[in-house]
Curated annotation (Swiss-Prot):
Present in high molecular weight complexes in tumor cells. Interacts with SDCBP2. The chain crosses the membrane at residues 10-30, 50-70, 94-114, 162-182. This is Transmembrane 4 L6 family member 1. PANTHER family: TRANSMEMBRANE 4 L6 FAMILY MEMBER 1, TRANSMEMBRANE 4 L6 FAMILY MEMBER 1-RELATED. Its main location: membrane. The keyword Membrane applies. It comes from Mus musculus. GO terms for cellular component: plasma membrane. The keyword Signal does not apply. It is a multi-pass membrane protein. It is found in: Membrane. The gene is Tm4sf1. GO terms for biological process: blastocyst formation. Keywords: Glycoprotein, Membrane, Transmembrane, Transmembrane helix.
């Protein structure tokens, strides 16, 4: 498989991962499908960092479309030398991949911190706070503690599920962008395969 085809497959994968990150982050604003918790500032502070919308989402679309668009570029013609156009394109894709690495890393960090701190919820006395902040993430392994959150209902499940989705997809994005850094450097330095004879398995 040519270097550019590998980049294209990575690009399509990043688009889907970005969509899932955006959707997961958006759902965090509406526990139980209600908007009042967002308007009353009763959401985890990490929800407002837009990690899935910006870091794992919109910022990830830039490298994704760069990788996908590489397949449509002219194979030859740069400075009068054949294949230089594609080689320059492959090397430039490394820069786009680095942007993706930054965005996905941001999403991974925020999602991890969000999981460690836990949701913001109301306790038995009606006080809103981070009930599990002092547990250092141990609440994730002890579901019997989740009953300490009275409102919103099932907020712990909601919080843990969506932040876990963000963490998982952002980690996948990070790995894919890292693969493209290697792929782009190989394609740029070792040469782009214009013919079917120069192929490798991605």
């Amino acid at each position: 498989m040519c270097y550019v085809k590998c980049a294209r497959y990575i690009g399509y994968s990043l688009v889907w991962a970005a969509v899932f990150c955006i959707v997961a982050n958006a759902l965090l604003y509406f526990p139980n499908g209600e908007t009042k918790y967002a308007t009353e500032d009763h959401l985890s502070r990490f929800v407002w960092y837009f990690a899935g919308i910006v870091g794992g989402g919109l910022l990830m679309l830039l490298p994704a479309f760069v990788f996908i668009g590489m397949d449509e570029e002219d194979c030859c013609g740069c400075c009068g030398y054949e294949n230089y156009g594609k080689r320059c394109s492959m090397l430039s894709s490394v820069l786009a991949a680095l942007i993706g690495i930054v965005g996905s890393a941001y999403c991974v960090i925020v999602a991890s911190l969000g999981l460690a701190e836990g949701p913001k919820c109301s306790d038995a006395h009606g006080v809103w706070n981070y009930t599990f902040a002092s547990t250092e993430g141990q609440y994730l392994l002890n579901s019997s503690m989740w009953s300490k959150c009275y409102e919103p209902k099932h907020i712990v499940e909601w919080h843990v599920t969506l932040f876990s989705i963000l963490l998982a997809f952002a980690a996948v994005e990070f790995i894919l962008c890292l693969i493209q850094v290697i792929n782009g450097m190989l394609g740029g330095l070792c040469g782009y395969c214009c013919s079917r004879q120069q192929q490798y398995n991605c």
